[in-house]
A protein has these predicted regions:
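A cross-family phosphate/adenosyl-ligand binding-site feature
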Residues: 1-72, 78-144
Length: 144
């Protein structure tokens, strides 16, 4: 559940058809605070790193880069190929946030939804959007 004061931010999240290159995110004149490609494949990661924009995901990512806006890529691959690791490392030096869809297990999730919430919570943290999808680390010792 989201906290009420942040619902207005979430309402601004828009999903687009990846084949629609006429969509607003394909243009630098569209003012977005951040771009998220979630999930993203190794192929898409490679295309973005190489500057190839053949669909809306790659085009909007390159728009984010040229306009110096926040770009978050959520790779879904496992394991990563060396080519993908090199592309992600390269883009990380450009300021791209690489946030693998890899949930933690230290919070002892009981459901698939809790695993999903963990990843979504990390994305929301990068966007400075308050949430209560996961517990914050308290620094307290826990029994094993």
């Amino acid at each position: 559940d989201m906290v009420p004061e942040d619902l207005s931010k979430i309402e601004r999240v828009t999903l687009h058809d990846n084949h629609n290159l006429a969509a607003k995110p394909a243009s630098g004149s569209a003012k977005y605070d951040a771009y998220i490609v979630c999930p993203t494949s190794g192929t898409t990661i490679g295309k973005i790193a190489a500057g190839i924009s053949d669909n809306l995901a790659t085009r909007s990512a390159l728009v984010a880069l040229k306009e110096r806006r926040k770009l978050i890529l959520v790779p879904r691959e496992a394991p990563f190929a060396t080519a993908h690791l090199e592309a992600m490392a390269k883009m990380s030096t450009w300021g791209v946030i690489i946030l693998p869809a890899s949930p933690g297990f230290y919070h002892k999730p009981n459901t698939i939804d809790e695993l999903i919430d963990f990843v979504v919570a990390r994305i929301l943290d990068q966007l400075d959007i308050n949430h209560n999808l996961s517990k914050r680390w308290s620094g307290e010792e826990v029994d094993h």
